């Protein structure tokens, strides 16, 4: 398939580009910077990748990306923290996602893959994540709130019969990132503390970015209609997380 991919220079996007090329697909990257795409190509040892420069919040700049493509994978998102980042988080994750999803349905792409977040489902009814989970009425932070806004659009389009595929990743970790992921920054902060300040209840879900890239690639099957999949990975409670971090860092 000829596949448009947003967020192509990000952590998930870079690994997804690699997986798409390995699987015989033809990716078209949507980027803000050619130089960062060059860095991703070098890091993952990829051939030259076709690309379109633009701004995800501009519907007009997205149209050339989607033209002549068969499918789209929407990985672009802002996962920053702090009050100063809130306007950008809302603009990219909510407005940008609406733009990609609606324009992709207008272009009759199949499938239309939306990378959401496990955080939009938390806490799950009954304590278990399933494909029947509703969007949480109490988002845990502004990031989750913005991703939920995007997922409301995705679910609406699913209800209308459009071939939208919703993917829920949890904490994404792994190698080969041109930057430093939010999960990696969080782990680094913990490791710098004299005593790891973890609560004694609850825990964390994490998975390898390469597994997510594989899932996204394998979802590129047309004529299967709306779908939802969780990529939740492995659960460690906080005491187990502390033991694990100590074991790998000494």
PLM segments and residue spans:
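NAD(P)H-binding glycine-rich loop region in Rossmannoid oxidoreductase-like domains
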Residues: 44-45, 49-95, 103
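Mid/C-terminal beta-alpha module of Rossmann-like enzyme folds, strongest
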Residues: 215-250
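N-terminal Rossmann NAD(P)H-binding glycine-rich loop of SDR-like oxidoreductase domains
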Residues: 3-25
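Glycine-rich "substrate-gating" loop/helix at the edge of Rossmann-like oxidoreductase active sites
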Residues: 140-141, 170-180, 198-210
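Conserved Rossmann-fold NAD(P)-dependent oxidoreductase catalytic core, especially the SDR/UDP-sugar
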Residues: 95-143, 165
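Conserved beta-loop-beta element that borders a ligand/cofactor-binding pocket
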Residues: 152-176
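Glycine/proline-rich active-site loop of Rossmann-fold NAD(P)-dependent oxidoreductases
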Residues: 174-185, 219-229
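A conserved pocket-lining segment of Rossmann-fold NAD(P)-dependent short-chain dehydrogenase/reductase
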Residues: 186-207, 211, 215-218
């Amino acid at each position: 398939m000829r596949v448009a991919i947003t967020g192509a220079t990000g952590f998930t996007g870079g690994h997804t580009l690699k997986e798409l090329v390995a699987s015989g697909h033809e990716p078209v990257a949507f980027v803000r910077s050619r130089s960062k795409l060059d860095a991703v190509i070098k890091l993952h040892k990829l051939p030259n990748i076709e690309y379109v420069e633009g701004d995800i919040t501009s519907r007009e700049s997205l149209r050339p990306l989607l033209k002549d493509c068969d499918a789209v994978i929407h990985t672009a998102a802002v996962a920053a923290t702090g009050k100063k980042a809130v306007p950008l988080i809302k603009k990219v994750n909510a407005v940008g996602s609406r733009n990609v999803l609606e324009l992709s349905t207008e272009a009759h792409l199949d499938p239309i893959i939306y990378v959401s977040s496990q955080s939009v489902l938390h806490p799950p009814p009954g304590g278990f994540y399933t494909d029947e989970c509703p969007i949480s009425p109490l988002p845990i932070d502004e990031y989750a709130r913005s991703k939920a806004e995007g997922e409301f659009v995705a679910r609406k389009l699913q209800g209308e019969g459009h071939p939208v595929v919703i993917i829920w990743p949890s904490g994404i970790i792994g190698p080969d990132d041109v930057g430093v992921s939010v999960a990696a920054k969080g782990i680094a902060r913990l490791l710098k503390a004299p005593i790891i300040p973890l609560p004694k209840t609850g825990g964390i879900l994490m998975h390898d970015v390469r597994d997510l890239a594989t899932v996204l690639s394998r979802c590129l099957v047309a004529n299967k209609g709306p779908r939802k999949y969780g990529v939740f990975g492995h659960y460690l409670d906080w005491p187990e997380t502390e033991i694990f971090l100590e074991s790998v860092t000494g």
